[in-house]
């Protein structure tokens, strides 16, 4: 066989599969676009639909932030794609996001990807709708009342101080992100589920934390439950978590609750009993898992970002310490120490600005998911009924007209109150509308306690400098933020 014949054969062998792939991709796009609403004259947003069935999920999962940045630069604030098995429109920008968040029940409804719904379960607050969501949220909200938060502060302080002291004794390198996750996990177990973390040995704690990590990594995956798939691994981790939580729930059902301070899980149990309903163990496990996931994952992300920004901006750290000194909080001597309380924490105005600026630049949750209840028009484009809508928090913060020099860390920008008009949707770290994060005040108080304990006890430096960040699905440093801690001696 001569060289020409070999080359021709090789080209045909390569060209045929490529041609079939391109043809399949084109037919897939035609199929997806036929789902547009013919009764609406407005066009679909620009964008591409990827490969048959997979859409652009694989690219998004593998490339994460890079994928979103490229799409944003190519197509602008609104574009179409195909993610997690559904045609999807991704939305950025304060005014566009405002219409989505304020359109709950009218234009859109919460609708997480199938993998998230399967792993977290139908009984968790994020997946409930209408009256069921309303009543469950009202019950859980009691765990985040001002009275409840006031009772949490001493326990938060105890757990944070214990962790900070451990870092000071841990030698030349502490991996900050895993250490903070462990701390926030203990706090969430103690305050939200009423479980004493002291009863769990280190091995059990690590196993449960690893299970949460595995579940978190695989929350957003293709809805294919086969061995070694993302959904399969996520469900296996979820089942391990449920088994541990079930033991805690059964113990809780057998003992008398503290009438003065009830955790969120106890409130859900009491709600079922008051209504004469049988205890739904599966729903309680799903609610408890969601509370633990939201209660430690997002706060750990924010606290890690705070640690990073304060280390990189010594002028801001000095301002925080001056505020602590003004409030009598800088000294760690027992005879001079002022007791932390919710009233004292609310006086820390500049510290609040630092937390807000951290949440602006590094919001723990990148966005939220909705589904169109009917076809509607957004900024000139049609969003067909049944299509998923993802609104972006991080990108909206990054381009908000509300903030000059959006890429600069400047807490002073929050010393002036935000306007109450639609531009306020340029800052939405906790979402907005009726689906606004139920635990946002809990998170704010916890982050303030963390800043107080960190800044009055420690000096620290980042061993790798400014960290690269990734989203999986919560924003976190790629290198786990290695740092060196040493005791702080007040000289202000």
Swiss-Prot record:
Induction (free text): By retinoic acid.
Location(s) in or outside the cell: Endoplasmic reticulum membrane; Microsome membrane
InterPro entries: Cyt_P450, Cyt_P450_CS, Cyt_P450_E_grp-IV, Cyt_P450_sf
Record EC number: 1.14.13.-
Catalysed transformations (reactions): all-trans-retinoate + reduced [NADPH--hemoprotein reductase] + O2 = all-trans-(4S)-hydroxyretinoate + oxidized [NADPH--hemoprotein reductase] + H2O + H(+)
Membrane-topology descriptor: Peripheral membrane protein
Keyword presence, NAD: no
Stored SUPFAM superfamilies: Cytochrome P450
Amino acids binding heme: 437
Family assignment from sequence similarity: Belongs to the cytochrome P450 family.
Name of the molecule in the record: Cytochrome P450 26A1
